[in-house]
Amino acid sequence: MLTRKQHELLCFINDRLLQTGVSPSFEEMKEALDLKSKSGVHRLISALEERNFIRRLPNRARALEVLRMPETATAKPTAAASGKAKAAAPAVPQAANENVLEIPLHGRIAAGLPIEALEGQSSLSVPAALLGPGEHYALEVAGDSMVEAGILDGDYALIRRAETARDGEIVVALIADAEATLKYFRREGAMIRLDPANRAYDPQRYKPDQVRIQGKLAGLLRRY
């Protein structure tokens, strides 16, 4: 039973250890969680230690070990976020608990409406373990253009707000300030290419000033 900040810090530490094998610095943790001082990081780490989620390794600087993650962490759909197909997605939770967070649900990805214009329509209950650090929102997927990435019509795409992306990441792209779409992001020379995950659809190419990134896919939920 973690607070949102405790959960964000635990996910940040775990992700950094998986990526680099080295714990993040207190300064990095402070910036990632948008805290005003390192004392806030110390308090969060102490709370995670008391709950046996992490431990500090003795006689080693910047040495933290993640002992366990919240139970719902096993459902994290990292393959979909990295662009690899998945046969199934975690189901939408039906009952609220302390490991479930409410994030804005902006409706279906719709032509003619930038994401900002869809603010505050409703909310979606999401297992906290699916959300790492950062600000998130959800979109209901419309259509079958991403089926080969395991993203089906009616799924809920969990989006981490971002303005930039690396090649191969799945993003919400706003095209010409008019049409929002969920696609693979790639740079191709002086152009931006948005790739579907369905052979029935063709890639679309745009000038960089025609495409604005509004977030990156962080996870997926499915209602059964």
From Swiss-Prot:
It is an enzyme of class 3 (hydrolase). The active site is at residues 145, 183. InterPro entries: LexA (IPR006200), LexA-like (IPR039418), LexA/Signal_pep-like_sf (IPR036286), LexA_DNA-bd_dom (IPR006199), LexA_repressor (IPR050077), Peptidase_S24_LexA (IPR006197), Peptidase_S24_S26A/B/C (IPR015927), WH-like_DNA-bd_sf (IPR036388). One of its GO terms (biological process) is DNA repair. It comes from the Bacteria. Pfam families: LexA_DNA_bind, Peptidase_S24. SUPFAM superfamilies: LexA/Signal peptidase, Winged helix' DNA-binding domain. Residues 26-46 bind DNA. The record marks 111-112 as: Cleavage. Its EC number is 3.4.21.88. Belongs to the peptidase S24 family. Represses a number of genes involved in the response to DNA damage (SOS response), including recA and lexA. In the presence of single-stranded DNA, RecA interacts with LexA causing an autocatalytic cleavage which disrupts the DNA-binding part of LexA, leading to derepression of the SOS regulon and eventually DNA repair. This is LexA repressor. The gene is lexA.
